[in-house]
A protein has these predicted regions:
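N-terminal leader/targeting and accessory segments in enzymes
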Residues: 1-95
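Phosphate-binding loop of NTP-binding sites
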Residues: 19, 57-58, 70-157
């Protein structure tokens, strides 16, 4: 699958881009500004945009999906081009839902402790060699990214 991220530099967005790239998808992205650690992490995988800003010429019908970051404006030229071409556009939550709708989902909710509880569950599953997809609110020890998306049966969010 070929995926383009509009506003790839955010914490959640760049982790999703890294996850899709590591699973073998062709990933590109753009942003008007990218800060550390996103910048270095994207660069290490060859996903850092060559130039900052929006480039509607990089949007074509060859793209299977656009994932739209929260700070992308409604008049973003790449978004407008994708709409014009009829490319499927997802928000981050929509993309995660579509990927996980047929999986067994373990959802951690509440005001406090979501990342801690998710981390504990992931460590227990890892200890027992249970492969699972996940989305967690921070980078945790023993895991390379905040997001993992594969064909695994389970997802912890």
């Amino acid at each position: 699958m070929r995926v383009h991220f509009i506003a790839v530099g955010g914490s959640a967005m760049h982790n999703l881009a890294l996850a899709l790239h590591s699973y073998g998808h062709q990933v590109t992205g753009s942003d008007d500004e990218i800060f550390e650690p996103s910048k270095t992490r994207l660069a290490e995988k060859g996903l850092l945009p060559k130039q900052m800003g929006w480039n509607p010429e990089c949007i074509s019908q060859e793209i299977d999906a656009i994932i739209l970051g929260m700070h992308a404006r409604i008049d973003n030229p790449e978004l407008l081009r994708a709409q014009e071409l009829g490319v499927k556009i997802y928000s981050y939550p929509e993309f995660i839902f579509n990927h996980s709708k047929d999986k067994t989902r373990v959802s951690i909710t509440g005001s406090h402790g979501k990342t801690t509880i998710t981390s504990m569950i992931l460590h227990v599953l890892q200890y027992h060699n249970v492969s699972t997809d996940y989305m967690v609110g921070a980078l945790i020890d023993g895991f390379d990214t905040m997001v993992k998306l594969t064909d695994d049966e389970f997802i912890v969010l």
